[in-house]
From Swiss-Prot:
<dbReference type="GO" id="GO:0061710">
    <property type="term" value="F:L-threonylcarbamoyladenylate synthase"/>
</dbReference>
<comment type="similarity">
    <text>Belongs to the SUA5 family. TsaC subfamily.</text>
</comment>
<feature type="domain" description="YrdC-like">
    <location>
        <begin position="7"/>
        <end position="190"/>
    </location>
</feature>
<dbReference type="GO" id="GO:0006450">
    <property type="term" value="P:regulation of translational fidelity"/>
</dbReference>
<dbReference type="InterPro" id="IPR023535">
    <property type="entry name" value="TC-AMP_synthase"/>
</dbReference>
<keyword id="KW-0819">tRNA processing</keyword>
<dbReference type="GO" id="GO:0005524">
    <property type="term" value="F:ATP binding"/>
</dbReference>
<keyword id="KW-0548">Nucleotidyltransferase</keyword>
<keyword id="KW-0067">ATP-binding</keyword>
<dbReference type="GO" id="GO:0005737">
    <property type="term" value="C:cytoplasm"/>
</dbReference>
<dbReference type="InterPro" id="IPR017945">
    <property type="entry name" value="DHBP_synth_RibB-like_a/b_dom"/>
</dbReference>
<dbReference type="Pfam" id="PF01300">
    <property type="entry name" value="Sua5_yciO_yrdC"/>
</dbReference>
<dbReference type="GO" id="GO:0000049">
    <property type="term" value="F:tRNA binding"/>
</dbReference>
<dbReference type="GO" id="GO:0003725">
    <property type="term" value="F:double-stranded RNA binding"/>
</dbReference>
<protein>
    <recommendedName>
        <fullName>Threonylcarbamoyl-AMP synthase</fullName>
        <ecNumber>2.7.7.87</ecNumber>
    </recommendedName>
</protein>
<comment type="function">
    <text>Required for the formation of a threonylcarbamoyl group on adenosine at position 37 (t(6)A37) in tRNAs that read codons beginning with adenine. Catalyzes the conversion of L-threonine, HCO(3)(-)/CO(2) and ATP to give threonylcarbamoyl-AMP (TC-AMP) as the acyladenylate intermediate, with the release of diphosphate.</text>
</comment>
<keyword id="KW-0808">Transferase</keyword>
Length: 190
């Protein structure tokens, strides 16, 4: 699988993100749709596209832990908890962290926490590095339809002109596992 994204494709995707628009891209298991987490306009576009209520909260996907630190509060983690998290990252495990009051409600929804993941998908790593921050990430599918696993499925659901970063998913059958960062409680099996 070759997920090395050409520089021009990265630049094109970053340009779309800077316009506060939503893009689709392959992740570990399915295609995701994402946008700039700091843009309420972009997040509202994503929520409208997905017909997803803001109260549900969202997931951020990043190239590294440093990109996530402005959005989460990791001060209560013990060394053991930190080791358990970093043993899973980068990889397809999402952790729910407490969120500081500065994290926008359009990301956290009705929660005082935020779900985050450091991806090991090389294309998404390249995209987040080029953009300089994490992306909001949720499965690429319209309400009631299965998540897209190919570029063709994304275009069939979202339209031929929807901005898609072409590439292959990581081949996982299930979406990421979701766990509480402080307790390790499993919220969703991966």
């Amino acid at each position: 699988m070759n997920n090395n994204l050409p520089t021009d494709a990265i630049a094109a995707a970053v340009a779309v993100l800077h316009k506060e628009c939503v893009i689709a891209y392959p992740t570990e298991a399915v295609f995701g749709v994402g946008c700039d987490p700091d843009s309420e306009t972009a997040v509202n576009r994503l929520l409208e596209l997905k017909q997803r209520p803001v109260e549900k909260g969202l997931i951020l996907i990043a190239a590294n832990f440093e990109q996530l630190k402005p959005y989460i509060d990791d001060s209560m983690l013990t060394d053991t908890q930190r080791e358990a998290i970093f043993a899973c990252w980068p990889g397809p495990v999402t952790f729910v962290f407490p969120a500081p009051a500065t994290t926008p409600r359009w990301l956290t929804g009705r929660f005082d926490s935020l779900a985050v993941r450091v991806t090991d998908h090389p294309l998404v790593v390249s995209l987040c590095q080029a953009y300089g921050k994490p992306l909001v990430s949720t499965s690429a599918n319209l309400t009631g339809l299965p998540p897209c696993r190919t570029v063709e499925e994304v275009r069939a659901q979202f339209g031929a002109d929807f901005p898609v970063v072409e590439g292959e998913t990581g081949g996982r059958l299930n979406p990421s596992e979701i766990r509480d960062a402080l307790t390790g409680e499993l919220f969703r099996q991966g």
